């Protein structure tokens, strides 16, 4: 099974179209989306694509909470869908539990972690539960941290608003005998 992890699309339709073509070409049927669908140039169009694609499992980002500026352009069904996206959720894949979050539990705008032992501990204390992997976004930087009490922290970077104008995301290859993570950083016009 191959699973994609994305975050921080920020309404970038070109990046979303490229990504959807990539996952179709590579037979990826599950997308763990860590929030911030909205924002940018085409937030409503991006939201509609993700809302209607059953491959996407979503959590809410800080931009998704700020739907007030789009209120006149959304249908009631779309408003309800956005308001009902959870801030966190645990997904079980091949008996491995993944906590999905965008940022901090009490404030989605806070920086999740600063990659120090103390800030990681505070970040993980936000979320109680039995999970092995913590998937988070918000910083737009890819990272893999695997040293805190056996938990692995993964940030896929930003699909639509990266600092180097490339699409960034992660792929998990998972089955009974294999588990590995690939970080992808692709130019929009690339054929990777």
Model regions: which residues?
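Beta-strand-turn-beta hairpins that frame and shape the catalytic cleft
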Residues: 1-4, 90-99, 147-152, 176-181
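Glycine-rich His-Gly loop
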Residues: 8, 103, 158
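Core catalytic region of metal-dependent phosphoesterases/phosphodiesterases
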Residues: 2-92
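His/acidic metal-ligating clusters that form di-metal
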Residues: 27, 77-144
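Active-site environment of divalent metal-dependent phosphoester hydrolases
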Residues: 10-15, 38-42, 64-68, 106-108, ...
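Acidic, His/Gly-rich catalytic cores of divalent-metal-dependent hydrolytic chemistry
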Residues: 145-192
């Amino acid at each position: 099974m191959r699973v994609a992890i994305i975050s921080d699309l920020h309404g970038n339709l070109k990046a979303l179209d490229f990504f959807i073509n990539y996952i179709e070409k590579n037979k990826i049927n599950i997308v763990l989306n860590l929030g911030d669908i909205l924002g940018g140039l085409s937030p409503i169009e991006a939201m509609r694509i993700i809302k209607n694609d059953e491959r996407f499992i979503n959590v809410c980002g800080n931009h998704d909470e700020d739907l007030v500026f789009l209120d006149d352009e959304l249908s009631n069904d779309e408003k309800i869908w956005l308001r009902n996206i959870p801030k966190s959720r645990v997904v079980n894949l091949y008996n491995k539990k993944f906590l999905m979050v965008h940022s901090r539990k009490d404030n989605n705008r806070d920086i999740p972690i600063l990659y120090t032992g103390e800030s990681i501990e505070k970040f993980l204390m936000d979320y109680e539960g039995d999970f092995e992997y913590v998937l988070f976004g918000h910083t737009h930087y890819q990272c893999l941290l695997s040293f805190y009490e056996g938990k692995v922290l993964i940030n896929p970077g930003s699909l639509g608003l990266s600092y180097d104008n490339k699409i960034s995301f992660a792929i998990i290859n998972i089955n009974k005998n294999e588990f590995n993570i690939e970080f992808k950083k692709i130019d929009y016009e690339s054929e990777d």
